[in-house]
Amino acid sequence: MLGILLQKATATLASGLNSSRAGMFPIALGLLLQLFFDHALAESTFLDKAFSLQAALLPMEHKKRSVNKCCLLTPPPPPMFPPPFFTETNILQEVDLNNLPLEIKPTEPSCKITCIIGPPGPSGPQGPQGIQGIMGPKGEIGEIGRPGRKGRPGVRGPRGMPGSPCSPGPIGPRGEKGDIGLTGLPGARGPMGPKGLTGQKGEKGIIGEKGQQGIKGEMGVMGLPGMLGQKGEMGPKGVSGAPGHRGPVGRPGKRGKTGLKGDIGPPGIMGPSGPPGPSGLPVMSGSGHLMVGPKGERGLPGPVGRCDCNLPQTVVNPSYNKFPTLINPPQVPAIFVVDSEDELEKLNTENALAFRKDQKSLYYRDTVGWLPIQIAPIQQMRQNPTGFCGDEIVQVENGEECDDGNRIVTDSCINCKQAYCGDGYLQSGLEECDGKDFGYHTCKSYLPGSYGELKCTSYCYIDSTGCRYFT
């Protein structure tokens, strides 16, 4: 019975705490202590032996018998604590008084009250605390009380120790399908998938309306002039276009370069030799060569020679018999033998003959230098070549490629050779320059206001990167 009271008191306290205020806890605790003390007195056997109930009630019956006029009952002792004042709920109404261990049944008075009940008297002094009674037998289990309100969640306990590993049990039957759960958090971004197929071409959109023309902005400040960039590389030579109409005759070109020295012509007919001067005494040198003496005085002029046109007059066959005998004819002082042309040029002797061993030919000294008398033996002498450069006949055997019969160096045939880029001659209409020949162009005429030197590329075009402007 005490356990039931404790449970109800605890429920009452919990409901009082939840429904009313936290200050109701001391009042409920005082009520619980009073009930516990009354139960202890009722179950105690010691009081039954020491003070029996009949012995205790004898004085009261004696008083009842002696007093016949009026019978007054003393009020019960006041509680230890004042009763609580509830505005919302009353905890005492929930206590079942029928289940209390002590049945408080009012005793009917043996005498009838005939007098008027007066006002209640003052409360008497509190009696002494009684001796704790003996705990009675355990009562029957009472009915299940009403479920109390849900309490606050308690503090989370410490994590338990992991259990001992054991073999997994058999797989149970498949449970029923649960309710649909809440949407989970978005997962991490997965890897990029393969490229999809190309979709169909969409329809052409409608042309939008033309927007309004904006306000014309203010004119900006004039920027600084940029730097002169480098001239780009010359591109490849383009395909030659169709020849244009013949232009007007240009001004005469400059004088061409000196041509190559032509072949030496055949030696002419030797004239009669003049009278030789007096010969000096030869002096023998240490090397065995003859030393030429000093030059003698000029001799007298000889008579006019005659020409015999019937027989060819050569060095071998001169027509001496036709001429009159000269008085004191000039004599050759010596004939020198040399190995090469260098040794021949070192000889400065006049009226002398020299024989070159490398050509096996004979030379004589003239005022202009050494001239050949016989280049080769008579039977090996070649005849005069037929044709020459400028006769308007192409002589392939002479190495001619063309023959226009003029000496103009600005056309396509120069010195019986085809003109080409790099020969040093500017070809009119096809080349801008060639070598050092720029025609009449300079930096000043090609780029007005500049100075410097023009250059000619390998494709015979003018390169003006060498020209500079005045800054």
Swiss-Prot record:
<feature type="repeat" description="2">
    <location>
        <begin position="420"/>
        <end position="443"/>
    </location>
</feature>
<dbReference type="GO" id="GO:0045202">
    <property type="term" value="C:synapse"/>
</dbReference>
<dbReference type="GO" id="GO:0031012">
    <property type="term" value="C:extracellular matrix"/>
</dbReference>
<feature type="region of interest" description="Disordered">
    <location>
        <begin position="237"/>
        <end position="267"/>
    </location>
</feature>
<keyword id="KW-0531">Neurotransmitter degradation</keyword>
<dbReference type="InterPro" id="IPR050149">
    <property type="entry name" value="Collagen_superfamily"/>
</dbReference>
<dbReference type="GO" id="GO:0005581">
    <property type="term" value="C:collagen trimer"/>
</dbReference>
<feature type="compositionally biased region" description="Low complexity">
    <location>
        <begin position="155"/>
        <end position="164"/>
    </location>
</feature>
<dbReference type="Pfam" id="PF01391">
    <property type="entry name" value="Collagen"/>
</dbReference>
<keyword id="KW-0732">Signal</keyword>
<feature type="signal peptide">
    <location>
        <begin position="1"/>
        <end position="30"/>
    </location>
</feature>
<comment type="similarity">
    <text>Belongs to the COLQ family.</text>
</comment>
<comment type="subunit">
    <text>The asymmetric form of AChE is a disulfide-bonded oligomer composed of a collagenic subunit (Q) and a variable number of asymmetric (T) catalytic subunits. The N-terminal of the collagenic subunit (Q) associates with the C-terminal of the catalytic subunit (T).</text>
</comment>
<keyword id="KW-0176">Collagen</keyword>
<feature type="region of interest" description="PRAD">
    <location>
        <begin position="70"/>
        <end position="86"/>
    </location>
</feature>
<feature type="domain" description="Collagen-like 2">
    <location>
        <begin position="293"/>
        <end position="307"/>
    </location>
</feature>
<feature type="compositionally biased region" description="Low complexity">
    <location>
        <begin position="242"/>
        <end position="251"/>
    </location>
</feature>
<dbReference type="InterPro" id="IPR008160">
    <property type="entry name" value="Collagen"/>
</dbReference>
<feature type="region of interest" description="Disordered">
    <location>
        <begin position="140"/>
        <end position="205"/>
    </location>
</feature>
<keyword id="KW-0677">Repeat</keyword>
<dbReference type="GO" id="GO:0005615">
    <property type="term" value="C:extracellular space"/>
</dbReference>
<dbReference type="GO" id="GO:0030198">
    <property type="term" value="P:extracellular matrix organization"/>
</dbReference>
<dbReference type="GO" id="GO:0030020">
    <property type="term" value="F:extracellular matrix structural constituent conferring tensile strength"/>
</dbReference>
<keyword id="KW-1015">Disulfide bond</keyword>
<comment type="function">
    <text>Anchors the catalytic subunits of asymmetric AChE to the synaptic basal lamina.</text>
</comment>
<feature type="region of interest" description="2 X 26 AA approximate repeats">
    <location>
        <begin position="388"/>
        <end position="443"/>
    </location>
</feature>
<feature type="repeat" description="1">
    <location>
        <begin position="388"/>
        <end position="413"/>
    </location>
</feature>
<feature type="domain" description="Collagen-like 1">
    <location>
        <begin position="118"/>
        <end position="282"/>
    </location>
</feature>
<keyword id="KW-0770">Synapse</keyword>
<protein>
    <recommendedName>
        <fullName>Acetylcholinesterase collagenic tail peptide</fullName>
    </recommendedName>
</protein>
